């Protein structure tokens, strides 16, 4: 085998038994949604999952939190969770120090460089870039890529059933199923939480792709016949679930770029047996994984036909698409290709596990009877999301929590300012304040020679088109320079509108429309997960309803340690006193509550 950094593993549960308990909890409650409402009973066990002491206030887990009443909806992990996740971060400074399959590492680094927004004269080309893994990448890869223990003697099955004297609660049932199966080592459950723009996608993709390649190499070592049979098997090996079709496209595009990157096996350090494997025709030169996206408007036949041709290594889709398979009445066993899914990622999990999604998400995961790793990934931990996690995974041996020291902190490289539209020269007009801000951005001397790009957030989709019309008709912006996106746009329309904002800024000379500025007006639809590459300017026209949405909106800029600025426009209705303290909180690196 290739040299790897081995770590000890903490084990999770078996999906079949767990989701059986999930179904029991539904029947007991009489309502599906009631089972996930985060009831307070059993809270002490839930707190153990997060390392908190139920007798102490939650605020003791962090030094300083910027919060304001009901607006603050972010959960603060305990000091214990932070310490476990942060241990050894400073000792890792290169991707070579992490347990990543060699060809996956080569493809990952090349893909990250290919999308990097070059700035300043320091580097002449992207080949000169020296990339370092981000804290979430270090923490996640070290935990998720730990080799599985062959024997786990920490939990004995007789210990699980011993001492029961009364009827167990729903939480006890779920917890018991986890404990029972720990000795069988079937499933490990991870949560990843890190600040926006911190490299979470590659934190889980590098782990996922490494596991797929390690599995292939393991089969090849045991039997070339088994290896060939596995490649031809009619099955899906792993699934990445995201809440929107825009994110389906984004994750799929990242995978496809990495999958197509060429590399020289001779330059990849490997022992003779691994090198022999990498020189196989189907392994040599690129990752050559079978990657499938199943998005909006695509028929079930696309999934079925692809699986019939052989193994799908990674399926990128939404829970809704997979749930739709249950409605097929003319197809025999529509979920049969998913019976052997071993790895599943829930990206933007706080959305996928909220009350409006969980009845779709959980039954889908229940179909993955052979699941080994479940990775639950999010940029924020809303309090309601944490309550849901506590109910599903109530003890510290049922889940592995991974967070970064900067979770819920807004990046210091973002400059935040507040404009009071009640003051002169705006005289109560927020749109006039917006127009003035856009005018100033075009003339501020930043990004010389490049098309400036600005994202403007409003609270209601009805406000999107009216604001676009106002900027065009009243403030003389060119129609081609101001774009509105709402949920009513078709996926292909959204993709076309997003194009200028999800790729590096073009030079003014190269822009086909000769634009100096492009403005995207949208709602929270575009605030989560979308990787706006190199966006420097975000304007929040309407203050969001809670701190969770504020963090996500601000997080569309300042990604991957690049600079950005955020302008909040307020009026007498929304000029909350605490807003004036936000810029200083960002400078000081204080967590949002």
Curated annotation (Swiss-Prot):
Gene Ontology CC annotations of this record: mitochondrion
InterPro entries in alphabetical order: DEAD/DEAH_box_helicase_dom, Helicase_ATP-bd, Helicase_C-like, P-loop_NTPase
Comp. bias (Low complexity): 42-51
Transit peptide: 1-106
Biased composition (Polar residues): 52-63
Recorded superkingdom: Eukaryota
Chemical reaction(s) catalysed: ATP + H2O = ADP + phosphate + H(+)
Domain Helicase C-terminal, residue spans: 433-593
Main localization (coarse): mitochondrion
Transmembrane region(s): none
Chain span(s) of sequence motif Q motif: 130-137
UniProt keyword list: ATP-binding, Helicase, Hydrolase, Mitochondrion, Nucleotide-binding, RNA-binding, Transit peptide
Localization terms from the record: Mitochondrion
EC number: 3.6.4.13
Similarity comment text for this entry: Belongs to the DEAD box helicase family. MRH4 subfamily.
Recorded domain comment: The Q motif is unique to and characteristic of the DEAD box family of RNA helicases and controls ATP binding and hydrolysis.
Name of this chain's protein: ATP-dependent RNA helicase MRH4, mitochondrial
